[in-house]
Amino acid sequence: LGILFSNANTWKEMRRFSLMTLRNFGMGKRSIEDRVQEEARCLVEELRKTNASPCDPTFILGCAPCNVICSIIFHNRFDYKDEHFLKLMEKFNENVRILSSPWLQICNNFPVLTDYLPGIHNTLVKNIEYTKNFIMEKVKEHQKSLDVNNPRDFIDCFLIKMDQENHLEFTLESLVTTVSDLFGAGTETTSTTLSISLLLLLKHPEVAAKVQEEIERVIGRHRSPCMQDRSRMPYTDAVIHEIQRYIDLIPINLPHAVTRDIKFRNYFIPKGMNIITSLTSVLHDEKEFPNPKVFDPGHFLDESGNFKKSDYFMPFSAGKRMCVGEGLARMELFLFLTSILQNFKLQSLVEPKDLDITAVVNGFASVPPAYQLCFSPV
């Protein structure tokens, strides 16, 4: 069920429907950009409330991408203080920590252990159940107010599809799983990237200063950043690409099954075999990115300072199984980061050289260490 872990026809149907629906609601178009810009303004106002005092930005940075997904799926955003929203965010944050823990890696290799031993995998199961119940309640609300001639969001479109076509793939269970997948993939990955981004900019203040200089020159102070600005901001674009390359957020891709027997480089791979690819092998390829362990925006700039694309840049995976929400995630990273740096100077509580940027947990995802900073208005 869903998109992330399904295969064959189920995956094709869910991916096709999800892509089509997200595009119809403007992913990569103006309407979604409006939603992200609105959320960026809310994010800036929330950061302003810190009054330049030391704070851990993790939670606030998680709220913004989660609210964008909420607006697409539920047709409404939540206040950052909303009780249900806070609980949902708490579950998502906890799940990423659990999924990235050594214990979960052991459970993946020896699944029989999960039936007999206590452990955090049980918390993961409970959190997933909570999320699915939350989504199901929203689905029930949508069923009561559904207007087939005027779909409001992703859930409405799915319910209409269920009614129109009696597909085995389009069921309530599949709807809940697909929405859960969109939440999981569209919230935590972006929020974790944002959190690590600010940490890296604290570690490299000269990079942050150059980005702010470009923002001042291209956008100024009197309007919000928009996606049209990106093509005129090669350094900022290079910095965002380098952040994603350097952090290698999902080092090992999700497992996917081979659909038919195949021979690859003298290896025979039978149908049904699960394949796990290493994204690190391309993102940290020494031939493409000299000194790959060094954070250097120059990896994505040519000699003239223009943005330089790379076929090795694939933090969203590659091929037909690449992330459905890549366009949305790239939009969020650009608009959220430029909005933050347009309005604030990032101030570290310790000397940049003393900042530890080593991932605390490195399993499913690279999770940054806890840190604090001050958002000083500019």
From Swiss-Prot:
Needed co-factor(s): heme
InterPro entries: Cyt_P450, Cyt_P450_CS, Cyt_P450_E_grp-I, Cyt_P450_sf, Cytochrome_P450_fam2
EC code(s) of this entry: 1.14.14.1
Main location: endoplasmic reticulum
Matches recorded under Pfam families: p450
Keywords tagged on the record: Endoplasmic reticulum, Heme, Iron, Membrane, Metal-binding, Microsome, Monooxygenase, Oxidoreductase
Binding sites annotated in the UniProt record for heme: 323
Topology relative to the membrane: Peripheral membrane protein
GO molecular function: heme binding; iron ion binding; oxidoreductase activity, acting on paired donors, with incorporation or reduction of molecular oxygen, reduced flavin or flavoprotein as one donor, and incorporation of one atom of oxygen
Reaction equation(s) it catalyzes: an organic molecule + reduced [NADPH--hemoprotein reductase] + O2 = an alcohol + oxidized [NADPH--hemoprotein reductase] + H2O + H(+)
GO terms under biological process: organic acid metabolic process; xenobiotic metabolic process
Annotated compartments: Endoplasmic reticulum membrane; Microsome membrane
Enzymatic class: oxidoreductase
Organism this protein belongs to: Oryctolagus cuniculus
Name of the featured protein: Cytochrome P450 2C15
TM ranges: none
Function: Cytochromes P450 are a group of heme-thiolate monooxygenases. In liver microsomes, this enzyme is involved in an NADPH-dependent electron transport pathway. It oxidizes a variety of structurally unrelated compounds, including steroids, fatty acids, and xenobiotics.
Expression induction or repression: P450 can be induced to high levels in liver and other tissues by various foreign compounds, including drugs, pesticides, and carcinogens.
CDD domains referenced in this protein's UniProt entry, alphabetically: CYP2C-like
Top-level taxon: Eukaryota
GO CC annotation: endoplasmic reticulum membrane
Family statement: Belongs to the cytochrome P450 family.
